[in-house]
Regions:
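Alpha-helical residues within the helix-turn-helix
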Residues: 27
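Short cysteine-rich clusters marking metal-coordination/redox-active sites
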Residues: 61-65, 81-84
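Cys/His-rich metal-chelating microdomains
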Residues: 68, 87
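Short, flexible, mixed-charge glycine/proline-rich loop motifs
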Residues: 49-59, 69-75
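Short capping segments at the starts of secondary-structure elements
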Residues: 17-24
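Short metal-binding segments enriched for Cys and/or His
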Residues: 88-99
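Short alpha-helical segments that sit at the start of domains
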Residues: 1-9, 70, 99
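Charge-enriched amphipathic alpha-helical scaffolds
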Residues: 32-54
Length: 99
């Protein structure tokens, strides 16, 4: 990737056509996972302005009971499951698809 691109541009490029977690994005970009999570709401707004693309959020899932966090508005991983109180939660994955 060219170094002159901003982190948001690089994240958009990586998640276009695929789905990655914030941890995977952080590893690929060499930046902290928290920083990736701070960029995501801005990326959602950028993609929403483009009618030819849409942001996809694969929600977090509890690894113990299978609860799916469908109604969650935050883009980060939840701390624990509201059903079984387990902390084993699969991270959400993000992607961008063409309409």
């Amino acid at each position: 990737m060219p170094p002159e691109r901003t982190p948001r541009q690089r994240i958009i490029q990586l998640i276009t056509g695929g789905r990655l977690s914030s941890y995977q994005l952080a590893q690929m970009l060499g930046i902290p996972e928290r920083q990736v999570e701070e960029h995501l709401p801005h990326i959602v707004k950028t993609v929403a302005r483009d009618p030819s693309r849409r942001f996809i959020l694969e929600p977090s899932v509890c690894q113990d009971c299978g609860f799916i966090f469908r109604d969650r508005t935050k883009l980060t991983r939840p701390g624990r499951c509201p059903t079984c109180r387990s902390e084993g939660i699969a991270a959400p994955r993000y992607g961008i698809e063409s309409r």
